[in-house]
Every structure is written in structure tokens, then in C-alpha cells.
Curated annotation (Swiss-Prot):
This is Proline--tRNA ligase. SMART domains: ProRS-C_1. Catalyzes the attachment of proline to tRNA(Pro) in a two-step reaction: proline is first activated by ATP to form Pro-AMP and then transferred to the acceptor end of tRNA(Pro). Keywords: Aminoacyl-tRNA synthetase, ATP-binding, Cytoplasm, Ligase, Nucleotide-binding, Protein biosynthesis. PROSITE patterns: AA_TRNA_LIGASE_II. Homodimer. It holds the Pfam family tRNA-synt_2b. It comes from Sulfurisphaera tokodaii (strain DSM 16993 / JCM 10545 / NBRC 100140 / 7).
Length: 483
């Protein structure tokens, strides 16, 4: 069955606002502080399921969860000069306690490298204690001066998972970067989110990092959104805090660090990438409700009561197998109204039970993603539901991956690159000489952002010329219109 996607594709921004509000996921724009939204119960459950997955992946790889204070003293935040230069225009400052002026300004945490390094200097004294891998899931605050957008560009990022690790050598930290990349690949793959992995250019790396690796995806309007970053911090922060440890050879030296984070954007992408004009199609992995059962009333009350009891029996069978299910037996709503509501909420499967199913001892199961339906014997319902949920998960990932790949275009012609970015957006890959000046000029002439060097493909550009200066190319460079 062909499913309409016109609103989703052509008016994505309005579609997302509509879905978040009407599906009761996230109330944005009405709370009286710009750039701050409210997680509603249904959305909060989606958020919990996403965080449960990332916690599992981090815990399994030796990370330990911590919780640091929200407030960071000004002198602590400014310890690493390059770092504060990258954030100083975005920091919220607390300057009063009640009516009293504070002796030291306190920042609302924009990120936690400085506060975590400060505390690590008390905790870690020897290479024997390494590696250390910490993470926390907290709110961070950044005074965004660009137009704010729900979940994607916020002043309070409420779902900020930041990991911070400590290592004896640069090479150990580099290996941790690789582990972090693999953790995020497993995370996004399980969620069905397609991604590109790029090494950010020097001018766009994290403030205070040796280098930054980023995960990006393409949204329905063909603009690109950053969904995760991994930073090799080297010794920048440990030197700033004069934090040394004893090494294996007995000498004292500054340890090396990494940090990596994801945010609310992951949930925005989960809602966005598999939508249609009926609403989102949630991946069963994170759907708070995997199955909704809608009893279809009969003409007489006695048969209707039997249908509802039948539906409850089917529901219990599903619950006993660990499948989250809701039975919508609200007498005030018609079946059509119920279908509309649960489609808008993106519930992966709907089971309809009416007089026909009651008489035939069957259930009618309908997929949210394709709207394809089939009758199944009641005693096979659990088995069929499990099969369909797995198929929906895989099909959604496959469709999203196809969508992304179709929007990555290679060209060796600068004018063509400009035209593609202007007319179609998506991602353009061009040959690049490696010179930062050429990269910055590319941003200017294309009115796009350089995402960096692809790390997830190895296209040979040895015979190509840089699109800007015509010198021999050293690598590909990705360009895109971004959020």
C-alpha cells in the first residue's frame, strides 16, 4: 500500500512541530523561556528507552555512571583557554544567590570537561588506575543565538549523555576514540538511524580537542543534523589543571583524555526519519507501546462484551511474552478515531478484533509502516507479532539507509556542487587538497558547511584535483546544508 508522505517531505519543519505536539511527545514553544521544552509522558518513555540502550552499551564496555554538579565556577571553566573561547558566547551565568552578589560567577554547565578533569586530579594518581571511563546523562545549557528548534537546537539540552575517559598515552586515548565510534555505531544501528562518519576540519573541531569525529544524518528536508561526536582531547585539559600521574617508567606526566556525547537530537531523528502524513513510525526497539488492540464493537452489547474479553485475553498473552500492549476500549471514541490517534503516536502494530475475528478465533494485525494487514489464528498471534516487530525494525532501517545514500552525491565540478547544494541539499562529496584555506573558501562559495573527511568510505581520489585550487587531491571533503 502506498503511504502518503507529502507533508513529511515538503513541509518537514511544520510536520515535526505537529507530531511533537499532537502525539504528546514534547511541548515546545509554550514554556516561557525560549529554547526550552517539556517532555510529556509519552515522549519521556521514548527518551527512557533510548537512554536504557546507551547505558547498556556503555556499562558493557567498562564505563561507570557519575553525576556532577550543574554549576561550574568561572575560574574552573576558564582554565583551558581554547575551550572557553569556544563556549564563552553561549554560557549562562549565575551572578546572585538570593539578593547577594556572588564572589565568583557560576556557569550553568555547557559541557563538563573542566569540572571532570578537576575532580579526576584528586582521584587518579597512577597509570595503574587507568583507563578510567565515566559518563553522565544531564542537562546542559547553551545560549543559542540562532533560531531555536524543538530537540534540535535548544538552550537547555535535557538528554546530554557525555562520556569522559582518561588514559596514560596518546595512543591509548586514540584507541578509546575507536571504541567510542564502535559504541555509537552499535547504538545508531540498533535504533535504525543511518549515519555518516566524518573527521571534522581543524576549524570546526571541539574547542580544546586534538581532533573531532562526528556522526551526521540527513533529515527529510535533505538538511544534515549532527547526532554524535567523539573528541580526542590529548593533554589540553590535564595540562591546564597541572594534573599529572605516575607512568609505568616512574616518571610523572599529564594523562590523555577523550570525551564523546549525544543529545536530544537522537530522539528527534528517531521521530523524523520514518514518518509519513499520519505521523511518525516508531522503531519497535524504543516504542513505549509496541501493539495497540482496538476492539470493533458489534451491533449488540452482549457480543461487544465478548469481543472486549477476547481482546483482553489476546493482550494478556502478549504481555506475558514481554510485549508492551494497550487495549483501547474507550466507548466514547469510534474505531476510526482510535486508529488516527495510535497512528499519530507511531505504534508499530495494531490488532483489530471485531465480530468476524471473534467468530473465526482470529486477530487482524496491521503494520503502521506499510498499513499492510493480515488475519492470523489467535494462538499464533504472539509469534506473528514478534516476527512483524523484527521485520518492521529491519525494514525501517533499510528504508532510512536508502534515503541517506540517495542523497550523498560525488562531483569534481565546483559549479555542480553549488547547484546540488542549492537545489537539492543533501551531502556533496568533492576532492580536496587538504589545505584549510581551500576548505574555508569552499564553505563561502557554496554557502554550505564542511562536514569533514569521510571515515566510512575509501573512494580513490588520487587522480582527482581539488575543486578549489586544482592541486592534486588528498581526500574527499563533505559539504552540506545543516541545522
Amino acid at each position: 500500500m502506498k503511504v502518503s508522505k507529502e507533508k513529511w517531505e515538503k513541509n518537514f519543519s511544520e510536520w515535526l512541530d505537529w507530531v511533537l505536539r499532537e502525539a504528546e511527545i514534547y511541548d515546545y514553544g509554550r514554556y516561557p523561556v525560549k529554547g526550552m521544552g517539556v517532555w510529556m509522558p509519552y515522549g519521556f518513555k521514548i527518551r527512557q528507552n533510548v537512554l536504557q540502550l546507551i547505558r547498556k552499551l556503555l556499562d558493557e564496555t567498562g564505563h561507570e555512571e557519575v553525576l556532577f554538579p550543574l554549576l561550574i565556577p568561572e575560574d574552573l571553566l576558564k582554565k583551558e583557554s581554547e575551550h572557553i573561547r569556544g563556549f564563552e558566547e553561549e554560557v549562562y551565568w549565575v551572578t546572585k544567590g538570593g539578593s547577594q552578589d556572588l564572589d565568583v560567577k557560576l556557569a550553568l554547565r555547557p559541557t563538563s570537561e573542566t569540572s571532570i578533569t578537576f575532580m579526576e586530579s584528586f582521584w587518579v594518581k597512577s597509570y595503574k588506575q587507568l583507563p578510567k571511563k565515566y559518563y553522565q546523562i544531564v542537562s546542559v545549557f547553551r545560549y543559542e543565538t540562532k533560531a531555536t528548534r524543538p530537540m534540535m537546537r535548544l538552550r537547555e539540552i535535557t538528554t546530554f549523555k557525555e562520556a569522559h575517559t582518561l588514559h596514560e598515552t596518546y595512543e591509548d586515548a586514540a584507541r578509546q576514540v575507536d571504541e567510542a565510534i564502535n559504541i555509537y555505531k552499535a547504538f545508531f544501528d540498533e535504533l535504525g538511524i543511518p549515519y555518516m562518519i566524518s573527521k571534522r576540519p581543524e576549524w570546526d573541531k571541539f574547542a580544546g580537542a586534538e581532533y573531532t569525529i562526528a556522526f551526521d544524518t540527513i533529515l527529510p528536508d535533505s538538511r544534515v543534523l549532527q547526532i554524535g561526536t567523539v573528541h580526542h582531547l590529548g593533554q589540553h585539559f590535564t595540562k591546564a589543571f597541572d594534573f599529572k600521574i605516575q607512568r609505568k617508567d616512574g616518571s610523572l606526566d599529564y594523562p590523555h583524555q577523550t570525551s564523546y556525547g549525544i543529545s536530544d537530537r537522537v530522539i528527534a531523528v528517531l521521530i523524523a526519519i520514518n514518518g509519513d502524513d499520519h505521523g511518525p513510525v516508531l522503531n519497535p526497539v524504543i516504542a513505549p507501546i509496541k501493539v495497540v488492540i482496538v476492539p470493533i464493537p458489534a451491533k449488540d452489547e452482549e457480543t461487544t462484551a465478548k469481543i472486549i474479553n477476547y481482546a483482553k485475553e489476546v493482550g494478556e498473552n502478549l504481555k506475558n511474552r514481554g510485549i508492551t500492549v494497550v487495549i483501547d476500549d474507550d466507548k466514547e471514541k469510534t474505531p476510526g478515531e482510535k486508529f488516527y490517534i495510535w497512528e499519530l503516536k507511531g505504534v508499530p502494530l495494531r490488532i483489530e478484533i471485531g465480530p468476524k475475528e471473534l467468530n473465526n478465533n482470529t486477530v487482524y494485525i496491521k503494520r503502521r509502516d506499510t498499513f499492510e494487514g493480515k488475519s492470523v489464528p489467535k494462538d499464533k498471534a504472539v509469534e506473528e507479532v514478534n516476527t512483524l516487530l523484527e521485520k518492521i525494525k529491519n525494514d525501517l532501517h533499510e528504508k532510512a539507509l536508502k534515503f541517506l545514500k540517495e542523497r550523498i552525491i560525488y562531483t569534481e565540478d565546483l559549479n555542480e556542487a553549488k547547484k546540488i547544494l542549492e537545489e537539492r541539499a543533501g551531502v556533496v562529496e568533492v576532492p580536496w587538497c587538504g589545505d584549510n584555506n581551500c576548505g574555508l573558501q569552499l564553505q563561502d562559495v557554496t554557502n554550505a558547511r564542511v562536514l569533514g573527511i569521510p571515515l566510512d568510505e575509501d573512494k580513490d581520489v588520487s587522480n582527482a584535483k581539488c575543486v578549489m585550487c586544482k592541486k592534486p587531491a588528498k581526500s574527499l571533503l563533505r559539504l552540506a546544508k545543516t541545522y
